[in-house]
Amino acid sequence: MPFAQRRTDLPVLLVHNIDPRWGAKDREESRVAADALEAALRQEGHPVTPVTVAKADLESLLQPYDPDEFVVFNWCEELPGMPRSESLVPDIYERLGFTYTGANSAALAL
């Protein structure tokens, strides 16, 4: 069911990972896809701030942003250099108080 009114001014943090261990082709494909996603969000009217996670320092990357002012579009599959860390990503969002897209940490820990 469509919403009667859509909010298009909601600031978005587009969080995505690029692991330095990936090959050049995979890193470039990830950048191109993130750029396309950013463009689509902007086309809908959202101010977008891309946050590229290239090390396992997601929490420090998010520190400058107020969780009451941004929603996180979570496209970060894991923390670089930390295999099987997919449940840690939403755990960080939750601890910092961000609203985010995707499954929560408990679901991803299963």
PLM features: what roles do these ranges have?
Residues 1-110:
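ATP-binding N-terminal substructure of ATP-dependent carboxylate-amine bond-forming enzymes
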